[in-house]
C-alpha cells in the first residue's frame, strides 16, 4: 500500500496540470475546442510526445465530455486515465465510471494516427459504449467504429472491416478481435486483409480476459477428422479404474495420470504390450482425454447437458461467470470425450486451422493497459507476465458498505439453512437481496428453497441468462430477491430503488467462498456503489468445494453423515480461529495453482506462438510481394530439386518415373533407356526441365502475367495453409498425448518443445514439396468472366 500511496501522489501532480487548463477549455467555443485535435497532431509532428500533450489533451476531453454527455470526469477518473495511458492497470471500484475514464487515453493515443482500441467482454457493452462515447470523439474530429454487430449471424465483409479498423478509435470484444486476427491470417490476397497494426489497447475487465480466460485458446476449426470409435472404448475403460490405485489425481495442479498399475490395466484391456510406444500415440491421446473428462471436468461447474432441438448436447460453462459458452467447444477431442462420458451423441471432431491465446493476442500490441475492480490481488502476475503495475484508484465517494464477518458451519445443509434465515430476515425488512452461488446446481437448490418459503425471486444462471443485464439492473429495487451464479452482471450498475438506502441498501449474500479472492471482491462490489449503503456477507461450510479441494487432510475427518431435519433445526456456527484461517489458506493455495496453470499454458503456447509468427510473417510477405513471387518460387524449386536429386536414390528408371508422376508432372515422357539414374546432376537437370515446361505451359494457357502471378501466389499460400493446419492440429494432439506421461521421469514440457520443433522442421519440408506440386501438377481453367479456376492435386 505504501507503493500505491506514492503512485497516487505522483498522479495527483499530473492531475494538477490537467486542472490548470480547466478554465481555459471552458472558455473555448465548440469550434475552438474541436480545433485542438488538429493542433495536437501538428505538435506531435513537430516533435512533442503524447506525454507532453497529456495535461492539455485530457482537459480538452473533460470539457468535451461535459458538453456532449453532460458528465464531467471526476479527479479520480482523470487519475485512472493517466494510469491507462502509461500502460498499466487501473483498479477502479464498481460504479466509478470506467467507461468515461477511457475517453481520455483513447483520445490521446488516437492522436498519433496509429489507432487506439477498447476491448470489452461482450458485444452489448462494446456497442453501448461505442455509441455513447462515440459522440465525444466525433465532436472532437476523430473517427470511431465498433468492430462487432448486434446480430451475430451477420458477417462483415473484409472491405467493411477494413473501414472499421482504419478508424482512429475502435470498440470491440476480445473474442471478435481474436477471430478477426486469425481469419485475416488465412487471407489469400491484400483485398481480404483488413487489420491495421496493433498500437494501443485498453482492456476492460483485464483480469477476466488475461487471467481467467488465459487457458481457453481461440480456435478456428476447419476440415473434420475421421470420427474415432476410441471415445466410447476409453470411456468404458475409465469406469473400471480406481482412484490412487490405477490413476493419480492432483487437486492442486488439476492434473490426472495413470499409475504403473493403471498402465498395466490399460495394456491388458487394450491387449497391448507397450502402451506408450510411438505407434500407440493415438490410443494414449484418447485415454488421456477420457481420464480428463471424468476427473477434471465437472457437470454443472464446467459444462451443462442441455436438451437441444433434436438431442441432448454438452454446452461449456464459463467458471468465472457461470455463463454458457455458446458455439464454443473444447479442442483436441476433449469435447467428444465429455460427450462420451455423458452418453450424448458425439459431435464431429474438427481440425484446428488456426489458434491463439488471449495472452499472445494482446502481446501483439505496442502498449497494453486495462481496467478492473479487482487487480491489486494479482499485481505480481500482471508484473511478471505483462510488465504492468496495478494502481488502486481512490473512490470518488467513500465506500460505506458493511462487509460483515463470514459465518462458518460444519455441514453444507447447516450453511444453506442459516443463509436462508438471513435472507428471510432482510427480505422481511424490504432490503433487496442478491444471492450468489458457485454453481448452476446450487443456484437451483436455493431457488427451490425460496419457493418453498413463498419468496418471489429471479433466478439467473446459465440455463436462463437471456435477461441478465435487465435482471441485475432491477435487483436494487425494494423487496427484490435475485439468485445468481458467481459473476453474473459484471459491467452492469445496480441502482438502488426508492427507500432502499434508508433500509441499509442492497444486501449481497455469498453462499460460498470462490476459488479466487477476486471473485469474492467482485461479488461484494455489486453492493455499495458510488457511496451507496450496502451489506455483504459470506456463508461457508467445511464441505464447500474450496475447502474440500484445498483444505488440509485433517479436515476430512470432520465430514459426517447427517440428517437434514437435525441440522435444519440447529445450525451450529464454528467460531474457532483455526477454521477461519483455513478459508484464506485454501484460497491462496487455489490462486497459486491457477497462476501456475496459467504459466504452464503460456509456456506451451509460446512454442506455437513462435511457429505461428514465422508462418504468418511468411504468408504476409508473399501476399505483399508483387514482383518477388518468381524469386521465391525459384528458390523453393531449387531446394526441392536438389533434395530429390542429391538426397534420394532410385533403384530403377521406373522408380524415378513414378517419383516424377507423383510430384512433378502427369505429362512427363518415360525415362530414356540410356538415362543415368545414378547421376544426381542428370536427375536435377531432368527435373528442372520438366518444371520449366509445366510452368511455361500454364503461363501460355493463361495469357496474362497478372493471372499467372495470382495462380503462383494462391498455389504457395494453399501449401502454407494446408501444412500449417496439420501442424496446429499436431501440436494440440501432441500436448494431450504427453500430458499423461508423469511416470516416465521426463519433463512433458521439454518433450513437447523437442517434438514440436522436429514437427515444425518436417512441416517446412512438406510445405516446399507441396508448393512445387501445386505449381506443377494443378489443372487450370478460365471461366466466361476470364477468371482462373484452379484444381490442385
Swiss-Prot record:
Sequence positions that bind ATP: 77, 95-99, 493
Principal location class: membrane
GO-annotated biological processes: intracellular protein transmembrane transport; protein import; protein targeting; protein transport by the Sec complex
Superkingdom assignment: Bacteria
Enzyme class: translocase
Location within or outside the cell: Cell membrane; Cytoplasm
GO cellular component, one term: cell envelope Sec protein transport complex
EC id: 7.4.2.8
Entry membrane topology: Peripheral membrane protein
PROSITE patterns (UniProt xref): SECA_MOTOR_DEAD
CDD domains, per the entry: DEXDc_SecA (cd17928), SF2_C_secA (cd18803)
Coiled-coil parts of chain: none
Disulphide linkage map: none
UniProt-listed InterPro entries: Helicase_ATP-bd (IPR014001), Helicase_C-like (IPR001650), P-loop_NTPase (IPR027417), SecA (IPR000185), SecA2 (IPR022490), SecA_DEAD (IPR011115), SecA_motor_DEAD (IPR014018), SecA_preprotein_X-link_dom (IPR011130)
Catalytic reaction list: ATP + H2O + cellular proteinSide 1 = ADP + phosphate + cellular proteinSide 2
Keywords on record: ATP-binding, Cell membrane, Cytoplasm, Membrane, Nucleotide-binding, Protein transport, Translocase, Translocation, Transport
Role according to the record: Part of the Sec protein translocase complex. Interacts with the SecYEG preprotein conducting channel. Has a central role in coupling the hydrolysis of ATP to the transfer of proteins into and across the cell membrane, serving as an ATP-driven molecular motor driving the stepwise translocation of polypeptide chains across the membrane.
Family note: Belongs to the SecA family.
The protein's assembly and partners: Monomer and homodimer. Part of the essential Sec protein translocation apparatus which comprises SecA, SecYEG and auxiliary proteins SecDF. Other proteins may also be involved.
Protein name: Protein translocase subunit SecA 2
Amino acid at each position: 500500500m505504501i507503493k500505491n500511496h506514492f503512485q497516487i501522489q505522483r498522479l495527483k501532480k499530473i492531475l494538477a496540470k490537467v486542472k490548470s487548463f480547466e478554465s481555459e477549455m471552458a472558455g473555448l467555443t465548440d469550434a475552438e475546442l474541436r480545433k485542438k485535435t488538429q493542433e495536437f497532431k501538428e505538435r506531435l509532428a513537430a516533435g512533442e510526445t503524447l506525454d507532453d500533450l497529456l495535461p492539455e489533451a485530457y482537459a480538452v476531453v473533460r470539457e468535451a465530455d461535459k458538453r456532449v454527455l453532460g458528465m464531467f470526469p471526476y479527479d479520480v477518473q482523470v487519475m485512472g486515465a493517466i494510469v491507462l495511458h502509461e500502460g498499466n492497470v487501473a483498479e477502479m471500484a464498481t460504479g466509478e465510471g470506467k467507461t468515461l475514464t477511457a475517453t481520455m487515453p483513447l483520445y490521446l493515443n488516437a492522436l498519433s494516427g496509429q489507432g487506439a482500441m477498447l476491448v470489452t467482454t461482450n458485444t452489448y457493452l462494446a456497442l453501448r459504449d461505442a455509441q455513447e462515447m462515440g459522440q465525444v470523439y466525433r465532436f472532437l474530429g476523430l473517427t470511431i467504429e465498433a468492430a462487432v454487430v448486434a446480430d451475430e449471424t451477420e458477417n462483415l465483409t473484409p472491405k467493411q472491416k477494413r473501414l472499421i479498423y482504419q478508424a482512429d478509435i475502435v470498440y470491440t470484444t476480445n473474442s471478435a478481435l481474436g477471430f478477426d486476427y486469425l481469419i485475416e491470417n488465412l487471407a489469400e490476397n491484400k483485398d481480404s486483409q483488413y487489420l491495421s497494426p496493433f498500437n494501443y489497447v485498453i482492456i476492460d475487465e483485464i483480469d477476466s480476459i488475461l487471467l481467467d480466460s488465459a487457458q481457453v485458446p481461440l480456435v478456428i476449426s476447419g476440415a473434420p477428422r475421421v470420427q474415432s470409435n476410441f471415445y466410447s472404448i476409453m470411456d468404458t475403460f475409465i469406469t473400471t479404474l480406481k482412484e490412487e490405485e490405477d490413476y493419480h489425481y492432483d487437486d492442486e495442479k488439476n492434473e490426472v495420470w495413470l499409475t504403473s498399475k493403471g498402465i498395466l490395466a490399460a495394456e491388458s484391456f487394450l491387449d497391448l504390450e507397450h502402451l506408450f510406444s510411438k505407434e500407440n500415440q493415438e490410443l494414449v491421446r484418447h485415454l488421456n482425454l477420457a481420464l480428463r473428462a471424468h476427473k477434471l471436468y465437472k457437470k454443472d461447474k464446467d459444462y451443462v447437458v442441455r436438451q437441444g432441438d433434436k438431442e441432448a448436447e454438452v454446452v461449456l460453462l464459463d467458471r468465472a461467470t457461470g455463463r454458457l459458452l455458446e458455439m464454443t467447444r473444447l479442442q483436441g477431442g476433449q469435447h467428444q470425450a465429455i460427450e462420451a462420458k455423458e452418453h450424448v451423441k458425439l459431435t464431429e471432431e474438427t481440425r484446428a486451422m488456426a489458434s491463439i491465446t488471449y495472452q499472445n493476442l494482446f502481446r501483439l500490441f505496442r502498449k497494453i493497459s486495462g481496467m478492473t475492480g479487482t487487480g491489486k490481488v494479482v499485481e505480481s502476475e500482471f508484473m511478471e507476465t505483462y510488465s504492468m503495475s496495478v494502481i488502486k484508484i481512490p473512490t470518488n465517494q467513500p465506500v460505506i458498505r458493511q462487509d460483515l464477518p463470514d459465518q462458518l458451519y460444519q455441514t453444507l445443509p447447516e450453511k444453506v439453512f442459516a443463509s436462508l434465515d438471513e435472507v428471510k430476515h432482510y427480505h422481511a425488512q424490504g432490503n433487496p437481496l442478491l444471492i450468489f452461488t458457485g454453481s448452476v446446481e446450487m443456484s437451483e437448490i436455493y431457488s427451490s428453497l425460496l419457493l418453498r418459503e413463498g419468496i418471489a425471486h429471479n433466478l439467473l444462471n446459465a440455463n436462463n441468462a437471456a435477461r441478465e443485464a435487465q435482471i441485475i439492473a432491477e435487483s436494487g429495487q425494494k423487496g427484490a430477491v435475485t439468485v445468481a451464479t458467481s459473476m453474473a452482471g459484471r459491467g452492469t450498475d445496480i441502482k438502488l430503488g426508492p427507500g432502499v438506502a434508508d433500509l441499509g441498501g442492497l444486501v449481497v449474500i455469498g453462499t460460498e467462498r470462490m476459488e479466487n479472492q477476486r471473485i469474492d471482491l467482485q461479488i461484494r462490489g455489486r453492493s455499495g456503489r458510488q457511496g451507496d449503503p450496502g451489506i455483504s456477507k459470506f456463508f461457508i461450510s467445511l464441505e464447500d468445494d474450496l475447502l474440500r479441494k484445498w483444505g488440509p487432510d485433517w479436515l476430512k475427518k470432520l465430514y459426517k453423515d447427517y440428517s437434514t431435519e437435525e441440522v435444519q433445526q440447529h445450525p451450529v456456527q464454528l467460531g474457532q480461529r483455526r477454521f477461519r484461517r483455513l478459508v484464506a489458506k485454501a484460497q491462496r493455495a487455489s490462486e497459486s495453482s491457477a497462476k501456475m496453470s496459467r504459466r504452464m499454458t503460456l509456456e506451451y503456447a509460446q512454442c506455437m506462438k513462435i511457429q505461428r509468427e514465422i508462418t504468418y510473417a511468411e504468408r504476409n510477405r508473399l501476399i505483399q510481394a508483387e514482383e518477388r513471387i518468381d524469386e521465391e518460387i525459384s528458390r523453393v524449386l531449387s531446394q526441392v530439386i536438389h533434395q530429390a536429386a542429391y538426397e534420394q536414390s532410385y533403384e530403377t528408371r521406373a522408380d524415378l518415373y513414378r517419383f516424377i508422376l507423383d510430384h512433378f508432372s502427369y505429362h512427363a515422357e518415360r525415362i530414356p533407356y540410356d538415362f543415368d539414374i545414378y547421376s544426381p546432376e542428370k536427375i536435377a537437370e531432368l527435373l528442372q526441365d520438366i518444371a520449366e515446361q509445366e510452368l511455361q505451359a500454364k503461363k501460355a494457357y493463361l495469357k496474362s502475367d497478372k493471372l499467372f502471378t495470382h495462380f503462383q501466389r494462391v498455389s504457395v499460400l494453399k501449401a502454407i495453409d494446408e501444412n500449417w493446419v496439420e501442424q496446429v492440429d499436431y501440436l494440440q494432439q501432441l500436448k494431450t498425448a504427453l500430458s499423461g506421461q508423469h511416470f516416465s521421469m521426463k519433463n512433458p514440457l521439454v518433450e513437447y518443445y523437442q517434438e514440436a520443433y522436429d514437427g515444425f522442421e518436417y512441416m517446412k519440408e512438406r510445405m516446399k514439396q507441396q508448393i512445387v506440386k501445386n505449381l506443377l501438377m494443378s489443372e487450370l481453367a478460365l471461366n466466361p468472366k476470364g477468371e482462373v479456376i484452379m484444381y490442385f492435386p
